């Protein structure tokens, strides 16, 4: 166990935050030993798996950071068109998707290029371009932090929702995911519904894309919209897309006929948070050159809103986590003032 470790390499925002205690887990036995020794009970504990969806609000984390770095991918079973694959929690998510696509396995290709680790994916129920983790999730193994005992969680027990799971709410901090099992297919229809995908394929003359071509297209689309975290700190999409009642949406549509939307079950409508942010703005704040009345491209010294995607908040260096928190609050207020919609963070605030 190390003391006073700077977490800058362990969070994609690139903020300096000091962990009072820090331990890297490379084997499940190490985690169980840590629990047996009572270390997780002694300290306020943060389980960190990649750090790509975390915002440290303070300069010091007065507790223990447990960084999960276990590796391994194995085939559990293969039968006809289906294959069950297990990935350890510390596996890099984009690498795992790339591996599966390279094998010709369908089910997670639209989730390509989402930064993070496999173990964090179920916590957030990551999703993109019409696909969510829960669609291919079979089960996961997790260790209870109080006892060190291993438990298997089925899809139903995980209570997946939009960027939600039982690990993010009711059981937050009580379990550490150690591996995830995926049910994938050797042949399946590709999800090509989203406009960005259609436009990219058309632009590149691809009429009937292969699994690999779809994967590569999504990687290219994400690269065109998101900053390279090695150059500019960010956590990808900072806010969730709000889901509103159809009545509220119809009222908005009368005023904003071009508002994009996606129909949801039970009479709900999902509205892109990026569009709402881009079409509201910091009218009472100093604006970046060329930003007009939109948040898109807005900058306030160390932090700002990415110029290519209003949903992404960025850290240019030299700032603090609280700078992002304050910017997020201003954006939330401006969206609610203009559209009457509350947007909430997708990023985990620590």
What feature does the model see in each segment?
Residues 331:
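Phosphate/pyrophosphate-binding loops and the adjoining catalytic core of nucleotide-dependent enzymes
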Residues 2-3, 8-12, 150-313, 318-322, ...:
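Phosphate/pyrophosphate- and phosphate-bearing ligand-binding catalytic cores of soluble enzymes
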Residues 105, 321-327:
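Beta-rich strand-turn-strand
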Residues 30, 92, 269, 327-328:
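Residue-level preference for nonpolar/small residues embedded in alpha-helices
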Residues 335:
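Conserved ATP-binding N-box helix of the HATPase_c
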Residues 1-147, 151:
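Anion-binding (especially nucleotide phosphate/pyrophosphate-binding) glycine-rich loop
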Residues 31-35, 97-100, 198, 215-218, ...:
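A generic alpha-helix structural signal
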């Amino acid at each position: 166990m190390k003391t006073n470790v700077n977490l800058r390499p362990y969070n994609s925002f690139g903020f300096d935050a000091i962990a009072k205690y820090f331990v890297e887990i490379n084997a499940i036995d190490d985690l169980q030993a840590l629990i047996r020794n009572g270390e997780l009970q002694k300290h306020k504990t943060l389980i960190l798996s990649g750090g790509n969806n975390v915002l440290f609000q303070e300069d010091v984390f007065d507790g223990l950071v447990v960084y999960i770095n276990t590796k391994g991918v194995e085939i559990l079973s293969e039968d006809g068109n289906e294959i069950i694959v297990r990935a350890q929690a510390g596996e890099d998510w984009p690498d795992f998707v790339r591996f599966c696509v390279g094998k010709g396995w369908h089910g997670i290709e639209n989730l390509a290029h989402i930064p993070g680790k496999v173990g964090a994916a179920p916590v957030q129920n990551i999703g993109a371009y019409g696909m969510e983790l829960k669609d291919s999730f079979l089960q996961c193994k997790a260790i209870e932090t109080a006892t060190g005992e291993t438990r298997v969680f089925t899809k139903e027990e995980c209570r997946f929702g939009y960027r939600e799971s039982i690990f993010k709410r009711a059981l937050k901090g009580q379990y550490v995911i150690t591996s995830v099992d995926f049910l994938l297919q050797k042949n399946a229809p590709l999800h090509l519904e989203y406009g960005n995908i259609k436009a990219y394929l058309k632009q590149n003359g691809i009429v009937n894309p292969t699994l690999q071509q779809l994967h590569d297209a999504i990687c290219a689309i994400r690269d065109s919209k998101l900053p390279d975290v090695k150059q500019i700190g960010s956590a990808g999409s900072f806010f969730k897309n709000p889901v509103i009642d159809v009545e509220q949406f119809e009222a908005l549509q009368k005023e904003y006929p071009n508002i994009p939307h996606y129909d949801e079950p039970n009479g709900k409508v999902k509205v892109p948070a990026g569009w709402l942010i881009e079409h509201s703005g910091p009218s009472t704040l100093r604006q970046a050159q060329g930003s007009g009345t939109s948040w898109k491209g807005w900058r306030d010294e160390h932090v700002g809103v990415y110029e290519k995607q209003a949903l992404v908040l960025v850290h240019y260096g030299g700032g603090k986590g609280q700078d992002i928190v304050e910017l997020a609050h201003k954006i939330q207020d401006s969206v609610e003032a203009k559209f009457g919609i509350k947007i909430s963070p997708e990023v985990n605030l620590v």
